[in-house]
Amino acid sequence: MSICPKCGQKIDSNLNKCPNCGNKLDNKDNQINSPQINTSNIRIRKFIPWAIVAFIIVLLIIVFVLVRNYNSPDAQTKILVNAIDNNDSQKVATLLSSKNSHIDSDEASVYIDYIRSEVGMKKFARDIKSTVETLNKSDSKEAINLKTRAGNNYLRVSKNGTRLLIFDNMSYTAPTKKAIVKPKLDTKYEFKDGGKKKTVIADANKTTSLGTYIPGIYSVDAKKETEYGEFSGQLKFDFRYGKSNTVEVNENFNEALLTVKLKGKSDLDKDSLKVEINDKQMKYSSSREYGPYPQTKDVTVSALGKAKGKTFHAETKTIKARDLGNINSATLEFDDEEISDYIEEKEAEENSLKTKLSNFFSNYSFTLNSAISRSDFNLVSTFLKDKSSIYKSIKNNLNQSVAFINPQVISASQKGNTINTKVQHLNSNGQYETTNYELREDSDTGNIQLVDSK
């Protein structure tokens, strides 16, 4: 076999002419070209294995570089740093999540802002790189906590096995704290946690956890419900001011507190004063802040109090929703003339009743003492309602009864035919004691009789 010197076509050694270009060949060309071709083929055969080996080595180097770029401790660190630097909350959430702790992108976004403001990207990148290098050179599996400029832990770095049997696998864990509330009223909170709706019921004046969070400055949109209504706002908590395992939540809702001042109440019984807000009655106090109430609804407020057993109502006022602020006040006035007129009338009646009772107890005292000294129940029986408890008691214990001396009526009230009175008298030791009596008045004759004593 030879090669045409003109076109390079392979030609059978027995041919004198190139079948391709028609060039004529002589025996000299055939003799020269054949050895050259054989030598070239031998060289090519020797080169091919070395070329394959070189290719495999280059390929392995490329694969190693690629694997190292994604799996070495330094590469793992760069992935986290770049994710935070590029505000890739989804990537950060994935890197910080574990089987026992899921972190969503919203929480990761707050965490990124926290690192930027409390650590700074340059310090963060420098600290985490130095920490990983320290751990990578050490055989210890002890974790290292990264701290903010204020000294608060924000990231725990540790070794967790290996990757591809070559590289240390780095573990990045954000520390957590419980966000806690302590409401003054029984409260139901609704908000999103981990992308899902969450409901927490908190009892009044008891510490309750809303959930566990990684470092950040949070403002969580929420709704809450109390006995006074429904509110919209935010649950705010800041890890810069957290304690060892908890961080307190500050509530920021559309709330309206209300203080109430009353005029014309001087003649009313102090303990009977009440305010009525949105149909709910509460004990009155001039220093109390009532509520909170939603700023989205009108607030209606009134007041009531008693004098001589009668209930008096103050004027009613309504504060429109558009006028409600965080702190609101309402001044309500009673009709003091109506109250004073009623008191005068009742006092006149009471004085008349007290006079009537004073005469009754004066006669009763004299008659009872006579009945005791004579052991004659019939003398006093007309002062006692037949078969009443006091009737039976005196009848059965007349001989053991003590003298009833110097009775004085302190107070008296009448409702229908029933009279209640408080009487002070001297006991056998010469000391005053007070007894409450119940009497019945005959509606036809006006006569009164004792029914019970306490």
Swiss-Prot record:
Which parts of the chain does the record assign to the membrane side Extracellular?
Answer: 68-454
- Tell me where the transmembrane regions lie: 47-67
Instruction: Alphabetically list the UniProt keywords.
Output: Antibiotic resistance, Cell membrane, Membrane, Metal-binding, Transmembrane, Transmembrane helix, Zinc, Zinc-finger
Task: Tell me the GO molecular function terms.
Answer: zinc ion binding
Localization, per the record, is: Cell membrane
Q: Where are the zinc fingers (C4-type)?
A: 4-21
Which regions face the Cytoplasmic side of the membrane? 1-46
Please indicate if the UniProt record lists Transcription regulation as a keyword. Answer: no
**UniProt family annotation:** Belongs to the TcaA family.
Q: Which PANTHER family match?
A: MEMBRANE-ASSOCIATED PROTEIN TCAA
Give the function comment from the record. Answer: Plays a major role in decreasing resistance to glycopeptide antibiotics.
Protein name in UniProt = Membrane-associated protein TcaA
Native source organism of the sequence: Staphylococcus haemolyticus (strain JCSC1435)
